[in-house]
């Protein structure tokens, strides 16, 4: 399997491994609702939070949705979104490794990204999860109308990369029904008088 190398990769991986594990502590002042619920909001650095989840949830999470910084060049309150590619990769790699460790054998991870870091994200996910565990690239149109203020070609599409933990992972498909069959739509249009056949 090919490996993506960048400046600072080994240092970033070593630094992430050196981050100590912390136990999660409930803050009653910030708590709301049923104290026995399994739902939680974790405030803090996501690397430390992921490490804190491992003792409780390693190998048991069925679905992770990750929305990392897109590296757009914009400044956000909680993270810098204007990183060098190598810095961005060094940020993402150890977090993705921890997310992989949290996934159950039938688990999957769904990661939002745009074109700026899509190729790099795909390569490190192939390395971490395995090329054969790639499920799909879901492309979705985020903008439906062109703007006249664009300085170049407008990017209207974003991506969601989907990987499974193992190659044996099967999607939860809904059973096919007549309501989803293409012919039923044609029958609807015909009987509604919208089209004539």
Please tell me what each predicted stretch does.
Residues 1-65, 72-86, 91-94:
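DnaQ-like (DEDDh/DEDDy) 3′-5′ exonuclease domain used for proofreading
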Residues 41, 65, 110-112, 139, ...:
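Structured core elements
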Residues 46-48, 70, 115-117, 142-144, ...:
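Short, flexible loop/turn elements at secondary-structure junctions
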Residues 53, 74-79, 121-123, 149-150, ...:
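Short, solvent-exposed loop/turn and secondary-structure capping segments
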Residues 55-58, 123-131, 154-155:
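Short, surface-exposed basic-aromatic patches at helix termini and helix-loop junctions that form
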Residues 85-139:
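Conserved Class I SAM-dependent methyltransferase catalytic core
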Residues 142-197:
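Flexible, glycine-/basic-rich loop-and-beta segments that form/coincide
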């Amino acid at each position: 399997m090919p490996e993506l190398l960048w400046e600072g990769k080994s240092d970033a991986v070593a630094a992430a491994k050196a981050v100590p594990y912390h136990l999660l502590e409930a803050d009653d002042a910030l708590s709301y609702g049923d104290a026995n619920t399994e739902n939680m909001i974790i405030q803090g650095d996501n690397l430390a939070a992921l490490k804190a989840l491992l003792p409780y949830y390693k190998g048991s999470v069925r679905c992770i949705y990750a929305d990392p910084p897109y590296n757009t060049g914009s400044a956000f309150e909680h993270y810098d979104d204007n990183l060098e590619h190598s810095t961005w990769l060094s940020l993402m790699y150890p977090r993705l490794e921890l997310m992989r460790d949290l996934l159950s054998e039938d688990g999957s991870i769904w990661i939002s990204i745009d074109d700026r870091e899509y190729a790099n994200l795909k390569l490190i996910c192939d390395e971490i999860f395995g090329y054969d565990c790639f499920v799909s690239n879901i492309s979705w149109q985020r903008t439906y109308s062109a703007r006249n203020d664009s300085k170049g070609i407008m990017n209207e599409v974003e991506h969601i990369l989907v990987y499974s933990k193992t190659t044996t992972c099967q999607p939860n498909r809904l059973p096919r029904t007549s309501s989803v069959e293409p012919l039923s739509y044609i029958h609807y249009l015909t009987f509604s008088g919208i089209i004539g056949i």
